[in-house]
Structures are given as C-alpha cells and as structure tokens.
Amino acid sequence: MSILLPNMAEFDTISELEEEEEEEAATSSSSPSSSSSVSGPDDDEEDEEEEEEEEEEEEEEEEEEEEEAPPPPRVVSEEHLRRYAPDPVLVRGAGHITVFGLSNKFDTEFPSVLTGKVAPEEFKTSIGRVNACLKKALPVNVKWLLCGCLCCCCTLGCSLWPVICLNKRTRRSIQKLIEWENNRLYHKLALHWKLTKRKCETSNMMEYVILIEFLPKYPIFRPD
C-alpha cells in the first residue's frame, strides 16, 4: 500500500493537468468566436456604407450622362416635304411624228414656273440636246415602222419587232441623257428631270413627256 500511494498521486496530477489543458483550449476557442461575433456587426455596417456610396456614385454618373446626351434630332419625312413642294412641270411633245408615244420633238418654250430656278438658256440647251437625239433616231424608227406594217400580214406581226426594239433603245438613250443633265446641273438646283408616260390632252392615248420635279429642301437650319 505504501508503494501504490505515490503512483496514484501521480495519476491524479496528470489528470488534473489534462483537465487544465482542455479548459485552456476551450477558452482559447471561445475567445475568437466571441471576437468574431463582436466584430461581425461592424463589418456588416461598413459593407452597407460602401454599397450605398457605390450606388450613389452610379446614380450621379447616370444623371451626368443623361444631362450630357443631346436630344434626338427630329426626323422630317420625305412625303411631308413633297406634299408642300410645287406641282411638277410637264414638257410635252410638239413634233408632227409620234412613234409608240414618243414624239420627234419636245416643246422648247420656257415654263414660267421655272423662273428663278433655272436660266432659260440652260433649259433650252437641255431640251435642244434631247431633240437632237430624237431627230437622229426617230426617222430610222419611222422607216422600220412602215416596213413592218407592210409586211405585217406576211410575218404575222413579227416584222414589228425591229421598230419596237429601236424605240426602246431611243427611250434609253434619252433617259441616259436626262440623267446626265440631272447630275450636271439640275440636282444642284433642286430639280429632277425624268421621262415618263402621261395621257394626251386631246385623247386617251398615252405619250412620253419630260417631267420636271421640284426636289424638297430639308430644313437643316430649322430650330427644334
């Protein structure tokens, strides 16, 4: 018994030491949790303040962009501008020969509506070029038309095809000439020439006329 007592005392001291170590570990583990629980609300408040500041900065940037953005330009439709444009001018054929609606001469009289828009000399020069093209092409078309009519019964109408093709080529030549005149002068003066079909004044038949349209002027200096 005298031998066992010292050993039991040793075991008691060892168990006490282990219990003390466990208590120290528990206290050390609880201290960070308490500190974290204490520091948690402070961190949340700081995060909320940062988010509010960022949102305020974004709102200020959006307001600045809205203030700096110019107002959208007001679009004026072309139909609205054409509605208030003057009526187009018709230049009808004045020749004594007409082949498939195309006369051999256009009227060279200067329309009074074009006063102040284009010089009379320029108008007569342009009409003179068109008449020169017709004077060169129409006599050949008339000859082929007469031959086609004479042989129409024998060829079942096929003899009229040459004069139809020649008349189509003459129209294309005049259209190219008018387009050249537009690019040279008339588009700069807000005018547009074109060859188109219209009814005759004395009958229901169709004829080719030169239509002079007034191009709309866009109000670029008009305030919004």
Swiss-Prot record:
Task: Give the UniProt tissue specificity note.
Answer: Equally expressed in various parts of the brain.
Report the InterPro entries cross-referenced here: CHIC1/2, Golgin_A_7/ERF4
Q: How is it modified after translation?
A: Palmitoylated.
Q: Name one GO cellular component term.
A: plasma membrane
Region Disordered, as annotated, extends over 1-80
> Organism's domain of life?
Eukaryota
Compartment(s) where it occurs, according to its Swiss-Prot or TrEMBL record:
Cell membrane; Cytoplasmic vesicle
**The keyword Membrane appears for this protein:** yes
Does the keyword section mention Membrane? yes
Instruction: Name one matching Pfam family.
Output: Erf4
- Coiled-coil boundaries: 42-70
Composition bias of kind Low complexity appears in 26-40
The UniProt entry's sequence similarity note says: Belongs to the CHIC family.
Protein's UniProt name: Cysteine-rich hydrophobic domain-containing protein 1
Query: Which gene is the coding source of this polypeptide chain?
Result: CHIC1
